[in-house]
Amino acid sequence: MLKRLKFLARNVNLKDSEKVKEFIASQNYTDGYKDNLIDAYCHFCRFYAIQWVKPKYMREERITKVPKEEDINKIISHAKLKYATAYSVLRDSGMRPVELGMLRVKDFDLETGDVYPTTAKHGAGRVLKLRKATLAMLKQYITDNDLTPMDVLWKTKRVLQNWGRLKVSIAKKLREPHLNQIRLYDLRHFAGSMTYYKTKDIIYTMRFLGHKNIKNTLRYVHLIDFNKDDYHVSVAKTVDDALKLIEQGFEYVKKLME
């Protein structure tokens, strides 16, 4: 939110709500991004008691392909230990990158592999689990750098920047341009989708992702057939649509776009 407010402040007087509205409307952004700017400005207006009529933008449905684990791992395998560990934690846990940046050593149980993140977006608290290989990497990283329980492990901005550079480099090196399309946030999509695929439990998936409202989990529901080499995706706009596709042999998988 702060980043969006700073962007607006560089381009328009935030105390002039009509100018802000005109500026946002004039930009060549998606309605979804414009709506995010509006939401950020609404917080500013409430804080400074500025009266204005909030414009409405209709978010367009956009399908993002869930990356394959083998493609995620291709990128991770070329990262240095610090970042390979960070990416593996995201892949295993489905945390948001911003939540990763708040983790301290004390937030990990180095015996069980349990993780106790601070949930972003006022979400519900949860306990997550790392794979044994990821836990081993984490222990090595902590030992190699003599980290103490209160040390922060990663900075979100640097993790994002490193992922952006790394995927471009690996996509070029392996001559697999589709790797360049995998965003860091897609690791959360992968983890959420696989959690539902394995459990068939939307409530468990909601808690896994740290949502308080199941509507957030169901906001973007995709049905993916994992039995094929390439995922076949069909969008379900209602629960009835979802049930019909399940009857056709699809697996019901949660796919999040936040």
Where are these regions (language model features)?
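Basic, Lys/Arg- and aromatic-enriched nucleic-acid-binding interface segment
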Residues: 65-97, 122, 188
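DNA/chromatin major-groove-contacting recognition/catalytic segments
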Residues: 129-132, 136, 141, 207, ...
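Conserved tyrosine-mediated DNA breakage-rejoining catalytic core shared by Y-recombinases
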Residues: 70, 93, 102-140
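Non-catalytic DNA-binding core/recognition domains of DNA-processing enzymes
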Residues: 1-53, 130, 162-166
